[in-house]
């Protein structure tokens, strides 16, 4: 399939899922497997702001972070053959959700609260998972908090065109599964040329 005919809608891939679901690990591997570019939105936001996300939250608040996130997302408008790793809460910000829905294909990396807690219990760089005054949660407390946040986010996560369960699965297997499904999705999609029009049938 020529690059000039690949549909933009289906070859701009947004990876969503809770922190710890594997987006930042799977994303570059998936992009490499597909021959696509890769962008980690959280890393791009930090570069744009000149400081880590924890400081953005602490000094400017979540609303300022979400707006920075949206502006970063808009830089990929019109791109194709790119995998974009989203922050876990990006879909909860309505303007970002609307942009993503119209710009590309959403893929949900799904994992259980128990497995997410196991992966995140020793992480200190997730602002929404901290206790009061930055106190570290016990694993049980963390799992319960993740469960509550997942319940809030799940309706939008479930809008994804593709969902892949990452629990009890090797990273390589997940990448292979996603590669097959995305390539199938791109093949089935209407072909769009550089002028944005579908080519005429012979």
UniProtKB/Swiss-Prot annotation:
Catalytic activity: shikimate + ATP = 3-phosphoshikimate + ADP + H(+)
Transmembrane feature ranges: none
A cellular-component GO term for this protein: cytosol
Pathway annotation from the record: Metabolic intermediate biosynthesis; chorismate biosynthesis; chorismate from D-erythrose 4-phosphate and phosphoenolpyruvate: step 5/7
Keywords annotated in UniProt: Amino-acid biosynthesis, Aromatic amino acid biosynthesis, ATP-binding, Cytoplasm, Kinase, Magnesium, Metal-binding, Nucleotide-binding, Transferase
Sites where the protein binds substrate: 42, 66, 88, 153
Record's subcellular location: Cytoplasm
MF annotations from Gene Ontology: ATP binding; magnesium ion binding; shikimate kinase activity
EC numbers for this chain: 2.7.1.71
Binding-site positions, Mg(2+): 24
Cofactors required: Mg(2+)
GO biological process: amino acid biosynthetic process; aromatic amino acid family biosynthetic process; chorismate biosynthetic process
Family, as annotated: Belongs to the shikimate kinase family.
Role summary: Catalyzes the specific phosphorylation of the 3-hydroxyl group of shikimic acid using ATP as a cosubstrate.
The protein's assembly and partners: Monomer.
Name of protein: Shikimate kinase
